[in-house]
């Protein structure tokens, strides 16, 4: 099963993806984690990515698609992928569809975690205090959220038109959101 966890920064995508990895043996393909790893490597690419993320902007489609494509064989071997933070644009979604189709696969379901903006801001402040991620700086977060809303919003009709979009309340506890996700995945896993 290939699924996309969709939602704004701090919606809980990473938390839920990690749980699904543990419980279902899927591979989490988190562009955020991949980009942070590139930065930590100190490579030229990592330095370019750092500058973009520090400004709260989105990394180019070309870079993100290449990172995902490199990890698809690993996901295929595990029997499925959780795409976390990808795709972010319609161009990325179309590229993902093509990459998966070339492997005889597809996206099975898109789960959108809906969280109110004030709750997102509180979550990001808490995460910034606890983890100190530069891209969680409250000022940078406002830019990230605006970029998400402007560039990612067109993906909703893209996946809704394919009958793959399921919207879930992401405002509850980690456990409540997990239960909603599990319920949404039951018919997909059975089908």
Swiss-Prot record:
Listed SUPFAM superfamilies: P-loop containing nucleoside triphosphate hydrolases
Pathway: Purine metabolism; AMP biosynthesis via salvage pathway; AMP from ADP: step 1/1
GO cellular component: cytoplasm
Lineage: superkingdom: Bacteria
Pfam families to which the protein is assigned, alphabetical: ADK
Alphabetically ordered keywords of this record: ATP-binding, Cytoplasm, Kinase, Nucleotide biosynthesis, Nucleotide-binding, Transferase
Location of this chain's protein in the cell: Cytoplasm
Keyword ATP-binding: yes
Record's catalysed reaction(s): AMP + ATP = 2 ADP
Residues reported to bind AMP: 31, 36, 57-59, 85-88, 92, 133, 144
GO biological process: AMP salvage
Ranges for region NMP: 30-59
EC number(s) per entry: 2.7.4.3
Entry's transmembrane regions: none
Binding positions for ATP per the UniProt entry: 10-15, 127, 172
Principal location: cytoplasm
Record function comment: Catalyzes the reversible transfer of the terminal phosphate group between ATP and AMP. Plays an important role in cellular energy homeostasis and in adenine nucleotide metabolism.
Quaternary structure and interacting proteins, as annotated: Monomer.
Domain remark text: Consists of three domains, a large central CORE domain and two small peripheral domains, NMPbind and LID, which undergo movements during catalysis. The LID domain closes over the site of phosphoryl transfer upon ATP binding. Assembling and dissambling the active center during each catalytic cycle provides an effective means to prevent ATP hydrolysis.
Name listed for the protein in its UniProt record: Adenylate kinase
């Amino acid at each position: 099963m290939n699924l996309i966890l969709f939602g704004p920064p701090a919606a809980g995508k990473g938390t839920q993806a990690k749980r699904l990895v543990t419980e279902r043996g899927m591979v989490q393909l988190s562009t955020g984690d991949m980009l942070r790893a590139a930065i930590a490597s100190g490579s030229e690419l990592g330095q370019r990515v750092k500058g973009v993320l520090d400004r709260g902007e989105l990394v180019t489609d070309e870079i993100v698609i290449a990172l995902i494509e490199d990890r698809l064989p690993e996901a295929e071997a595990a029997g499925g992928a959780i795409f976390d933070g990808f795709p972010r644009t319609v161009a990325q979604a179309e590229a993902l569809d093509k990459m998966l189709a070339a492997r005889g696969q597809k996206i099975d379901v898109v789960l959108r975690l809906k969280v109110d903006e004030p709750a997102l801001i509180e979550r990001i402040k808490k995460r910034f205090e606890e983890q100190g991620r530069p891209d969680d700086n409250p000022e940078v977060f406002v830019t990230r959220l605006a970029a998400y809303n402007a560039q990612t919003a067109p993906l909703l009709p893209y996946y809704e038109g394919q009958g793959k979009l399921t919207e879930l309340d992401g405002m509850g506890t980690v456990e409540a959101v997990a239960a909603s996700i599990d319920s949404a995945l039951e018919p997909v896993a059975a089908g």
